[in-house]
């Protein structure tokens, strides 16, 4: 993990590999990025909650989801206290990484080009999320 934080849920790498699909492991544990438009959650607009695929912590409510046109599920606000951020200096730029506050799984990045009321765009990897209908 890029961060030195400690988390409520901590597992050794072999256990994460057993619990997650190879692609989930690559994104959540190794800070990967799925291909744009590859996740069915990008176009999911049902009522419900988006949970961390690593630990099932509710992260986003469906009423904060919007179509950003980027090919990744995007939200304008997380559930209070559900995510943490850290500075990501990879790819020759500075970005704000978003990770699950409970297991530390990499979710995506947050940008300041989102809609009102926050002006933020939480650009998430769909493979890092689970959608649970209300």
Which residue stretches match the model-derived regions?
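Accessory (non-J-domain) regions of J-domain/Hsp40 co-chaperones
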Residues: 1-7
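A short Gly-Trp-Pro
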Residues: 7-134
